[in-house]
């Protein structure tokens, strides 16, 4: 491979390993690499061995760029949005002839991001979410009870259903509305015309408008946001911005990431009967186990950034306006290792990770994700204590349009 543009990039060794085809070729992006699909731990381990910066110039042009693989470099980039900017993201929906921006993901300045954060962070705080913990557990228990007598299931379907129902419930909408769940799923998959997203927006607008006029509406974290938008002429967010935030929550950020984490947690537990028993006997360890799943199997293994100026990392020059991939999973595995971490007495111990990002773009829904994971895993283990992979079944990953890495299927039996 010719490295004349950046001559000090490391050689790609072992030859062809990261590509997975045995060829003497540069590595592919993790979304395209069969090596990642076969063994993601080995993929990131070998990527780190190539150096702190690894150039990807094969495969899909939209996925090419530079991987940052070291923990400290990833963390520094997350905390420096002026140099490593979040690329603009839009929905397929057109507004006044232009695509609707995905805010606050696409906001590039701290002051603008703070305008959103001041309104949104209190809605998704542990204190605001705490009243929903019991209902989230009840919802998980109901789903587990429904399938327990079947002696088998595709856990991906169960996790997707739970994540969807949980989000609708926490937001004050009917959790059992199958049509709403289908619309949310269609919006996640998306289409070039934006029709699926538009139908979801219309349904959300109708549902929230009806709720605002209903004094007996169920509780939900979005009601204060919508009430202030309607009644406060000095409210810091516009109606379009609030609509974009809500669409982002229901079509991109709020369902698939949690569903992915749940399925990978169940995959680990299906392979480890001792760990299942340990968590069942001591549920207080479940939050630490969930954090380890976020560290080892983050729904977004790497996130994109664009350099606003030339930078040098690990002796490698990265030009301005280059695509850079912050390898969150590689960063989390750097010091924590590739296995669930144990303490001196065998207890599950959480290690630091960056699955939720960092800095001003840190995931708004991280506390909700943790609450849902704890509720689901607790109730699942209470009702389905012993389970395993269905004989002959091999799990495979799939990369969703939202950039979430999910399992295609997870066939369990008990």
Where do the protein language model's features map onto the residues?
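Cytochrome P450
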Residues: 1-414
